[in-house]
Regions:
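Glycine-rich FAD pyrophosphate-binding loop
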Residues: 35-55
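Flavin (FAD/FMN) cofactor-binding and adjacent substrate-gating region
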Residues: 103-182, 190-196, 279, 318, ...
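Flavin (primarily FAD) binding-site architecture
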Residues: 220-235
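Extreme N-terminal leader/targeting segments of oxidoreductases
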Residues: 1-18, 33-36
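Core beta-strand elements of the Rossmann-like FAD/NAD(P) dinucleotide-binding domain
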Residues: 14-16, 207-217
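Glycine-rich Rossmann-fold phosphate-binding loop(s) that bind the pyrophosphate
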Residues: 22-24, 46
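Dinucleotide-binding Rossmann-like beta1-alpha1 core, especially the glycine-rich loop
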Residues: 59-141
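C-terminal catalytic lobe of FAD-dependent flavoproteins
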Residues: 163-169, 173, 234-283, 290-428, ...
Length: 546
């Protein structure tokens, strides 16, 4: 079979009530909110949805325990409320995870301070704490560096292993509500006329065609590119709006003694460091380094990789970790509010809405900051800012993909029977697609090609790729394998997996040899630029692990 991918209709000369620039989690959440309110909404993204900061984060949905140190109780309260909402509505994507706060005799924080902070954290949550068993606590303590006296403090937060999937679901809901969405569509400028933002000049990167749309409101949600959009549009702010902060992570094979809980500790320089179970691997992050370069080309430095490897090696000396345990490293630029001379840890994680009226651009607003946890509440605030009435959260209907428990064997069996696929495949489909999994499974019955695994080492099937192209606005192989069906983030993925996946996907999409080669080459370029293999820096990093 060959899947027909329809060309995208032109946007030229169309009118929208709201144009949202930037397809990360904040932009998608805002577009969804505006569309649900019945406003004609356009969402544009220069690359792919969730390809920026969203897919380069620590992947936790948290109340913000450390925000309490800076007195940001309101932000913690908001974050906890949104965490609980995501746990309830997106239970297949967002799950509780046990955290351990680690202290030793060299830690800057005292045990009393941590105990008081956790007490307040639980009070704000209005939720009884679930604690780890004593045996598991002792097991973790045994594998930590025995040269220190450790104190372990247990609390609960949440993890979204694949925020790319959360974005895909919200995107689907935005379109179902009437939004028009375009990825791989660059904003060349916002046209300002007579003191008002009126039009947006776009370039479709797939066709190379320039298009112009007009809007009642223009919302700049471009993350670390916010200031660039302003500069291109001749909107002059008194100071930069965003202070880009690079956060790097390393992904490691699971090692002996690797915890099933998330660990939260501090490095020698006081920086918080997380060690988390993720995607059958171990995720370690993050750093905070000022970054004024192109956010699209950011990459972890040798020094950052060394720093993170040294940190986790010091925590688990018995594991004898080395460069060879690192599968890859990645980095993203967090769009924190610009604060001259401030320490990174002191910069607020609260979001801000900057109205450009005083700068000669009425009806244009830039969104600064924001995080995975509070994207939905930011969207409601932004919609209200531009005069849109939005329902209270309790009135919002739960959409596709919610209200499923990925551990329910009955649901897994139903999906497996519907698609004639294995229980392992059915479980993976449910965890990534929620209630849509049953429709994808039924589609898979059409042919053996659709039931085939994407690559020999994956339980995810080609039918999920078809769903990505048909309903989730995937355009390239990278859109699919890194974000919609992110199997390429797995522990064993290699260039040979890329080739095998391209062959199987190409057979369904009807690619000829030329198209297959072009798609594969473009994907490998994107994958290797995003997921940096540290083996090329062995001489630097082996010393760090010794």
């Amino acid at each position: 079979m060959a899947l027909e991918v329809k060309p995208r209709p032109s946007l030229d000369s169309q009118h929208f009530h709201v144009v949202v620039i930037g397809g990360g989690i904040n932009g998608v959440a805002i577009a969804r909110e505006c569309a649900r309110a019945g406003k004609r909404t356009l969402l544009v993204e220069q690359s792919d949805f969730a390809s920026g900061v969203t897919s380069r984060s620590t992947r936790i949905i948290h109340g913000g325990l450390r925000y309490l140190e800076h007195g940001e109780i309101g932000l913690v309260r908001e974050s906890v409320r949104e965490r609980e909402r995501l746990l309830r509505e997106r239970s297949h994507l967002v799950q509780p995870i046990q955290f351990l706060f680690l202290l030793n005799e060299q830690s800057r924080r005292s045990a009393m301070k941590v105990r008081a902070g956790l007490w307040l954290y639980q009070r704000i949550a209005h939720k009884p704490a679930r604690h780890m068993g004593e045996m598991e606590l002792k097991r973790i303590e045994r594998v930590l560096d025995s040269g220190h006296q450790w104190s372990l403090f247990n609390y609960e937060d949440a993890q979204c292993e694949f925020p790319e999937r959360l974005v895909a679901e919200w995107l689907t809901e935005a379109v179902d509500a009437g939004a028009v969405v375009r990825n791989h569509c660059e904003v060349l400028a916002v046209d300002i006329a007579h003191g008002r933002a009126r039009e947006v000049l776009l370039r479709d990167r797939n066709t190379g065609k320039d298009e112009r749309v007009d809007a009642a409101w223009i919302l700049n949600c471009a993350g670390p590119w916010v200031d660039r959009i302003c500069q291109r549009s001749s909107v002059r702010t008194a100071k930069p709006l965003v202070g880009g902060m690079r956060g790097s992570h390393i992904v490691m094979s699971r090692f002996s003694g690797a915890p099933n809980a998330a660990l939260y500790t501090e490095a020698a320089d006081g920086r918080p460091v997380f060690v988390l179970p993720w995607n059958e691997q171990v995720l370690v992050g993050t750093t905070e380094v000022a970054d004024t370069g192109d956010p699209g080309r950011t990459a972890p430095s040798n020094e950052e990789i060394e720093y993170l490897l040294r940190m986790v090696s010091q925590l688990f000396p018995k594991a004898k970790l080395s460069i060879h345990d690192i599968k890859y490293a990645f980095a993203g630029v967090r769009p924190l509010p610009y604060t001259a001379g401030a320490k990174p840890s002191a910069v607020t994680r609260r979001h801000f809405l900057h109205d450009h009226s005083d700068e000669g651009a009425v009806k244009m607003i830039s969104v600064i900051g924001g995080k995975l946890t509070t994207a939905a509440s930011l969207a409601r605030e932004c919609a209200r800012k531009i005069g849109i009435q939005v329902p209270e959260p309790k009135l919002i209907a739960v959409g596709p993909g919610s209200a499923l428990d990925p551990l329910l064997d009955q649901e897994v069996l139903e999906i497996a029977r519907a698609g004639s696929v294995s229980e392992e495949t059915a479980r993976g489909m449910m965890e990534w697609h929620g209630q849509r999994a049953i429709d994808i499974a039924r589609m898979a019955l059409v042919s053996a090609e659709l039931r085939a695994p994407i690559c020999p080492h994956s339980s995810h099937i080609v039918a999920e790729v078809v769903e990505a192209y048909r309903r989730e606005w995937a355009v390239s192989l990278g859109d699919v394998l890194l974000r919609r069906v992110p199997v390429a983030l797995g522990a064993c993925w290699s260039e040979s997996c890329s080739r095998e996946a391209a062959l199987r996907i190409g057979a369904v999409l009807g690619w000829n040899d030329l198209a297959l080669g072009a798609n594969l080459e473009a994907f490998e370029m994107e994958r290797t630029a995003f997921l940096k293999r540290p083996a090329q820096h062995t001489s630097v990093l082996e010393a760090a692990a010794d």
